[in-house]
Structure formats: structure tokens, C-alpha cells
């Protein structure tokens, strides 16, 4: 499962090498998980699954302990970050794009989402299979990107996690 992250590292290395060899002003943006209004209803990522459960009034069922922690970024914030990097970033530098205030575990995110539509009356359950390893879930990890370097260019995330979910759920509800 690490091929995705390793692939990103290789591409970043190739860009840096090409930039040095051919004097191209490459700037790298490392985006955290990004979402917001407009995500497809059938998107397979965990944040979309949680939103669908809220919309459909189904309990959120976790098949792990939900201890993995990540940071997230709202789509529009990600776009403004990319524009900031293009306009003000230094060639040869990498910038993390994330809202550092959104760091949350999968379990706590499920709890957050379960309370966004109180009328749904959904709960968070854990149904951890005995043969968990055979399901291919990522190991528990903490992925907290630090966007301080990007903020020093004048960028600031504007949408928090709860509002990200409120907008996502509203958007997904329109197509459900």
C-alpha cells in the first residue's frame, strides 16, 4: 500500500532533478487529503463514506480502531494555496498544503460526522474482523502536515473540518 506515497516521492525527486538539469523553476505542493462540496456521491474515500452514512441515516461502522490521525484541507483553500505557491513560492522548494487545525483521528472524525445531522440519529460502531490484516487497511499512522512554510507566504486556511463536512453533506445531498 505504500506505492502511492513512494510514487509521489519519486515524482518529486524527478521534478527536482529536471529543474536542476534544465533550470526550470519547479515548486512542489504536498497536499493533505482535500475535500469539500462537489465530491462525487460514490467517492470511495473514508470522509465520503462518513458523509454518505450521515445522509442515508446509517450508522458509521469502523473496521479498525480508527486511531490513524490526518490533517485535511478544504478544496477552495487548496486552490488558494496552489495559487499562492505559484505566485510567491520559491523555486526548488516544497510546501505542505493543509489546515493544521483539522488534525483528527478517524474515530473522532466519525463521531464529529455522526453529530452533524442530529435528525439522522446515527451512531459510530466498531466491527473489527479477526482477520483484519487480510482486508488491506493501512496500518495506524499519524500524518500531520505542517503548513507553516506556506503560511509564511501569506496563505491561511479558512474552512475548518466541521464546516468542510457541512458543505460536503449539503452538496452530496443534492445528488442523492
Task: For every predicted segment, state its role.
Residues 54, 58-176:
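C-terminal substrate-binding subdomain of Rossmann-fold SDR/epimerase-dehydratase oxidoreductases
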Residues 7, 21-25, 88:
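Short coil/turn segments at alpha/beta junctions that flank glycine-rich nucleotide-binding fingerprints
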Residues 3, 7-10:
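Active-site helix of classical SDR
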Residues 43, 47-48:
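Amphipathic alpha-helical segments in well-structured domains
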Residues 38-42, 137-139:
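Short, solvent-exposed loop/turn segments at secondary-structure boundaries
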Residues 10, 14, 18, 50, ...:
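Hydrophobic alpha-helix immediately C-terminal to the catalytic Tyr-X-X-X-Lys motif of short-chain
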Residues 1-3, 17, 42:
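Active-site loop-to-helix junction immediately N-terminal to the catalytic Tyr of the SDR YXXXK motif
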Residues 12-37:
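Conserved beta-loop-beta element that borders a ligand/cofactor-binding pocket
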Amino acid at each position: 500500500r505504500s506505492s502511492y506515497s513512494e510514487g509521489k516521492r519519486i515524482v518529486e525527486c524527478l521534478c527536482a532533478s529536471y529543474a536542476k538539469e534544465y533550470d526550470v523553476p519547479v515548486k512542489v505542493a504536498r497536499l493533505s487529503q482535500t475535500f469539500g462540496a462537489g465530491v462525487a456521491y460514490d467517492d470511495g474515500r473514508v470522509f465520503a463514506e462518513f458523509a454518505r452514512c450521515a445522509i442515508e441515516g446509517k450508522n458509521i461502522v469502523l473496521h479498525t480502531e480508527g486511531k490513524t490521525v490526518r490533517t485535511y484541507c478544504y478544496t477552495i483553500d487548496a486552490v488558494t494555496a496552489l495559487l499562492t505557491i505559484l505566485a510567491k513560492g520559491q523555486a526548488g522548494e516544497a510546501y505542505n498544503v493543509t489546515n493544521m487545525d483539522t488534525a483528527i483521528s478517524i474515530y473522532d472524525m466519525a463521531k464529529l460526522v455522526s453529530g452533524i445531522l442530529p435528525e439522522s440519529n446515527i451512531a459510530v460502531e466498531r466491527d473489527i474482523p479477526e482477520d483484519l490484516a487480510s482486508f488491506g487497511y493501512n496500518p495506524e499512522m499519524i500524518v500531520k502536515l505542517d503548513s507553516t512554510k506556506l503560511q509564511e507566504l501569506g496563505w491561511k486556511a479558512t474552512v475548518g473540518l466541521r464546516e468542510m463536512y457541512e458543505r460536503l453533506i449539503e452538496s452530496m445531498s443534492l445528488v442523492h
